[in-house]
């Protein structure tokens, strides 16, 4: 029992190095380093470089591209270098320091000739011996690695590659539930037991190895303990050793981690995986592990050689000149080179890139308010002239009268604004919102796309239930979609007919004899379909939609808003009346919409349309767990239209005029159109006028928004008909980049719309409405930071990771991806499960980046004490800031910006 508890504890702690990976059909952005944020970004970068040879800093090419495009100001970088050098004193001639800095900051690689020079070997050996004598490890530290990493096989590759191939084979067999006709035998018992049963007959193992498998314990924890003991791994190194194995295939391990969270009977899935992996490693390594002890010394020697070569190359000090110094002087030089290594300068380049963006964002806001200052009351805009090198920009509107208490009755009637449209904070909504506001008396609002509703949706047109909220939050309620009994019966029959056709096709494809006949039967139709889809993608997609609407038309549906008793549901179905009032009130507060209601309020979810795209869910709403957010929007709108809810809101101080109507639309991000999801049958005259005005303006809005968006796609030249071109891109099954998604996301602004209204933020900013004056205790701000801002940070870091380390954190080229086991994609037929974004999602061409890999900048419009209170009360967010996983800036009522570093 003690052993079992110890191993389970080790695995529980080791899981920090991977992230749960949901199936690709419900792809949700994940921060690959969420479990590591107790350490600083810089420390994690060093650790990953040591244990997996993964560099998470932008490389030389990315830095040079950023400089060339004006995204990175070199003077900012140079100032950072100067400041860093002033903080330390080195007993080294200044000209050597200057030469070293001037050379290493270019991020040039040290030529191999320097590493191979005999004098470098002599110096490295000298320092290694001195290190042994002094028992000093001040310059370097190596984490425990799997044994198989240190052993090279006959093909010249690490033995861990053979271990990986075995684990890919077995994990694919276990996970597959959708594609294969014959699933893994005994998988219902557990992954480990199913493997034990089958591996005894696997002839990729020798007869002796199969005998070892036959004698393994039935308990996976005991197996893990046995292998670790066999390899003579110290108990204090158990976690590091297990972490190395989890990082070997983080995609497959992440998928198992996800499944262990979803089903009680699979809660020990990672334990099973590690037991199998460690046994496979033991079988393949054999007795060679005894020679691995020498690996640490050889790595130390190699580290000294690299550092000596770096000093000689960057300082322009020949190795024979270095040898003329005494050992203490040499140690000083090498200590400097170790301290001022290339990663230090990569980090400075990254910080300079982020500071440049921060400065440019300030300038945009400042310029935006200066351009309208003449048209606004002096109490609404106050642009300070006190900008200088020692003071932050002072640019903000001092709009303490923006609520306009003197005209509250006028505002309640909403006469100046015809419609208010609440969009998801998704960066793709920013340009669309800007064009809507420019088209007429329309106001836009930013809120997370799940609209604050912690629900699991059970939609009639979806096979499985879906958690329609941020993935870090468990659902608390289930909402069912239903229709009249007759309509539902007809729809179910149509669904079953369609399903049986697809099932028959799949059955024929996966069986030997029918698969020989299938090409003859389906060939002509599929060939014609291929030709039509290739030549006329937009028309073929429209035709398919018409056929679907005719033969599988979804009936008019309702939602289970009111609480229902359902003994089959593990969650409460629907809400009580008080819960409806509470959720409506919270959502309206999060939208900063508690007064001045327009006649027509639209809650706009968003969705993306693309064809033949395994990663389509990555273009959906991240706040809804990789699905469209129209369902949540419809639920909230229907609640807000209820008289009893409005009466309850009135008692809480929120009065919604009787003439105000809530409706629902969906922003299609791939075509920049607004599709109506729910419009009440009865509209007041002024609400109807607003509805018609918005509809009349939409064609022009879509054209402008599509033109702006399509201009950024690399494969498009001049666009004469942007709406048609956008629809073609969304329909073309050969298009690898139907839209840019959330690429180039860089900031998250929490504040009043007046702060950014009319300013072109280039589709790089998440915008969330917030008024600190209405949030006396900071609860709303904490909610925004803990939910929407966290989702935005996860999205940001997933794009970041997929750009800086695409081989490890990305998913490769879409053209060579293989959908596997119904859960994800691989490159070819035997790779890790690729859990990041594809190359086409972040790069414009082979050597041209599109996404700018910088950490998220969170901007809060509030006084300093409000931000300080947030950091004091929210330790999780404060840790992200202090450990450099994101950047934080605030702007107060006087318009002064402050960076919280």
Swiss-Prot record:
It is found in: Cell membrane. Its main location: membrane. InterPro entries: DabA. One of its GO terms (molecular function) is zinc ion binding. Signal peptide: none annotated. It is a peripheral membrane protein. Pfam families: DabA (PF10070). Its cofactor is Zn(2+). GO terms for cellular component: plasma membrane. The keyword tRNA processing does not apply. Keywords: Cell membrane, Membrane, Metal-binding, Transport, Zinc. Zn(2+) binds at residues 424, 426, 606, 621. Forms a complex with DabB. Part of an energy-coupled inorganic carbon pump. Belongs to the inorganic carbon transporter (TC 9.A.2) DabA family. This is Probable inorganic carbon transporter subunit DabA. It comes from Staphylococcus aureus (strain NCTC 8325 / PS 47). The gene is dabA.
